[in-house]
Amino acid sequence: MTIEEARTLIRGVEWRGSRPGLSRVRELLHRIGDPQDTLQFVHIAGTNGKGSTAAMLAAVLQAAGYTTGLFTSPFLEQFAERMQVNGQPIPDAELAAACETLQPCIAAMDDQPTEFELVTAAAMLWFQRRGCDIVVLEVGLGGRLDATNVIGAPACAVITNIGLDHTEILGDTLAQIAREKAGILKPGTRAVSYPQTAEVRAVLHETCARLGIPLTEVDADAIEPLRDSVDGQTFSYRGAVYDLPLLGRHQLRNAAVALETVAALRTRGWRIPDAAVHAGLAQVRWPARFEVLRRAPWFVLDGGHNPQCAQTVADNLARYFPGRRITLLVGVLADKDYPDLIAQLDPYAAAYIAATPLSPRALPAEELGAYLQRFGKPVTVCPDPAQAAASALAQAGEDDVICAVGSLYMAGAIRTYLRREHDENSGH
């Protein structure tokens, strides 16, 4: 099978959309020999911070010498990013080989899998073929009925920051959403949690008590920021000092989740030296999370798509770029709470550019532009995200800041454009 045929297979199931439930992915994996049963996992659910926390843990485990798989979604620039081993995305030939194994199994199924289920199965097969010692596995949506929850008890189950998102599927209270996320907790694992609201903590404590598993919660008071600039942060947690290239105070809490997860893994026999923890955190890369892509003018990229993320971006703009003129390049999905997202960011905006993310669920730039008019600031409508980035750069002064925000489905196109522009200008 060629990579084009593999992509056609994946696209062919894409139109079926998202259908919660484990029966299809369970059947598909069983038909290929249940590769997930031969692997060890750190399973991560939550509303925000899943990807950043997963990237930190994968970097630490790799630095400790383990062959480390990483499964995340969605991708930014290329599909292969969704499954990586030791920081390297799956090669085309190996993705094609995994899909070739899956194809006859899919054809034999009465109830055919969704795109996410197919990709989850392909990843499990590839991680097994690559001999992964451990896989950091990010939930796609929710937890209880997510395809990744087909695994048995993981070495550690991690719950990152829980907020209101996907309410039409997961429920419209924090407690309901927390119950869905807590569906990844199983007897025989250990649980680690971000510092949550009282409502969420109550659900996690009740679930862990019922399952008879230990729960470690990050102690937010034990996090001490020591240095903070656009070049990265230094902080201490429980007295030990760490460097972190990711920006924003929330990333210190995500890092503390990673540190508590390392401690939990150590109790289960995983050998993770302190030096590997320091090296992993210092080297971690996780694009499109308040990522500074260029300076003079500054261009910051954030894929955040809900009000919680917007508050984080607003805090970071105030912290890193006080007093500067900021243009917000915004693109959103129509089913997201974009009025609240924009309301959080508007105090920092001198002007807006409206773009259309690369998704069938996108709100058209024209509609977004019309909505933005109410804030009484200049609004430019430029549907193509790359052209919107070019337009923003053309209008910006040396000291100005452009902040692209609202959707990971827009962030990838902008990141690709800026990388190519940088390569052309530097003669690469």
Regions found by a protein language model. Give the residues of each.
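N-terminal leader/targeting and accessory segments in enzymes
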Residues: 1-48, 52-67, 76-78, 190-193, ...
